[in-house]
């Protein structure tokens, strides 16, 4: 697999109009919405995060969590909230990078033609569990932005677990599968792990990783 990145790929103008999104199928809305949530969460915990990017990411997490379910049901409010949320997430992560969830998702999409947002959504809870030991103290703010009830009264471990549970629930609510069963082939895991480790997003992950550890993450998603 070859990654192609060039400044000529970046548009000079982007028209973000929720009315133009009203014909999107539910599955596409769910997948792209969960990709946007992954942008915001990974951008918030990445090694390169800063005060300004944190501001964008937390607001994006709030907007996406509040509006993705409605967008999947094609409500005008949901579409508008998601249009704004995904745009704000892009303003954040494009300045600080992403992490292991995206690096693992890229290979899946290339090898199996799995929609990128679906791959991100399935891997995100696993990535959060993996990164909890080094970035778990930041999960409380993510959970708070997602509207997790009682999170201020929880200790850090409880808040992290509640945040991961909220991510899983949102993904399930919009129809995303919970694992890679039927998608991932065990014989491809070595290749995928090597590709993920070499991916441009991998160095931004808050926890340093290895090909062997990524292999175990893939295996856990079967």
List each language-model region with its residue ranges.
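Short alpha-helical scaffolding segments that buttress acidic/His motifs in well-ordered protein cores
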Residues: 37-41, 82-90, 104, 124, ...
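Alpha-helix C-capping/helix-to-loop hinge sites
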Residues: 22-24, 43-48, 67, 71, ...
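Flexible, glycine/charged-enriched surface loops at secondary-structure junctions
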Residues: 47-56, 70-81, 96-101, 153-157, ...
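Carboxylate- and glycine-rich phosphate/diphosphate-binding segment that chelates Mg2+/Mn2+
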Residues: 1-96
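C-terminal catalytic subdomain
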Residues: 96-162, 168
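C-terminal charged capping/lid subdomain of soluble metabolic enzymes
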Residues: 139, 149-222
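A general structural signal for well-ordered alpha-helical segments in protein cores
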Residues: 34, 61, 101, 120-121, ...
């Amino acid at each position: 697999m070859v990654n192609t990145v060039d400044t000529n790929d970046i548009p000079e103008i982007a028209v973000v109009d929720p009315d133009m999104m009203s014909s999107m199928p539910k599955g596409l809305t769910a997948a792209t919405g969960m990709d946007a949530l992954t942008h915001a969460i990974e951008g918030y915990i990445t090694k390169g995060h800063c005060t300004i990017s944190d501001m964008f990411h937390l607001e994006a997490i709030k907007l996406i969590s509040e509006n993705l379910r409605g967008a999947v049901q094609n409500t005008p409010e949901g579409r508008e909230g998601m249009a704004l949320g995904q745009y704000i997430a892009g303003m954040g992560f494009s300045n600080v990078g992403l992490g292991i969830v995206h690096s693992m998702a890229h290979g899946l999409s290339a090898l199996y033609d799995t929609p990128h947002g679906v791959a991100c959504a399935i891997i995100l809870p696993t990535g959060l569990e993996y990164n909890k030991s080094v970035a778990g103290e930041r999960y409380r703010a993510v959970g708070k932005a997602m509207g997790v009830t009682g999170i201020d009264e929880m200790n850090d471990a409880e808040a992290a677990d509640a945040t991961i549970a909220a991510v899983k629930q949102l993904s399930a609510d919009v129809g995303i599968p919970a694992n890679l069963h039927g998608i991932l082939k065990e014989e491809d895991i070595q290749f995928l792990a090597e590709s993920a480790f070499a991916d441009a997003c991998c160095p931004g992950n808050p926890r340093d990783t290895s090909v062997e550890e990524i292999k175990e993450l893939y295996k856990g998603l079967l």
